[in-house]
């Protein structure tokens, strides 16, 4: 279940990773973010959040971190993973829809 905090973080991250313009009628094209780069950025963010959570857990086991920090890091990693899974599901759905189109 996605909490309000996770939704707010996802919204903030989507604004930071917004895709530039695809092109304009006049022929001049602005350099936008490549879709592959956008996916790579989302994956890198999820990986980083997971590593931060792992380090917080290890620090808590050693008695060097607060439990609240550990829970916050785990929640952030979970939200990132849910975002990546949602993106993956949407990409698969779009691919399947394209494959169903008649030639």
Curated annotation (Swiss-Prot):
UniProt keyword annotation of Lipid metabolism present: no
GO cellular component: bacterial-type flagellum basal body
Biological processes, Gene Ontology terms: bacterial-type flagellum-dependent cell motility
Entry superkingdom: Bacteria
GO molecular function: cytoskeletal motor activity; structural molecule activity
Similarity section: Belongs to the FliE family.
Name of this chain's protein: Flagellar hook-basal body complex protein FliE
Species this chain originates from: Caulobacter vibrioides (strain ATCC 19089 / CIP 103742 / CB 15)
């Amino acid at each position: 279940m996605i909490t309000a905090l996770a939704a707010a973080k996802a919204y903030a991250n989507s604004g930071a990773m917004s895709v530039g313009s695809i092109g304009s009628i006049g022929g001049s094209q602005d350099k936008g973010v490549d879709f592959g780069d956008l996916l790579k950025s989302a994956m890198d963010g999820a990986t980083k959040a997971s590593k931060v959570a792992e380090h917080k857990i290890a620090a808590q086991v050693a008695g060097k971190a607060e439990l609240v920090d550990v829970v916050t890091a785990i929640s952030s990693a979970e939200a990132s993973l849910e975002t990546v899974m949602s993106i993956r599901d949407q990409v698969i759905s779009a691919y399947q829809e394209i494959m169903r189109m008649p030639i």
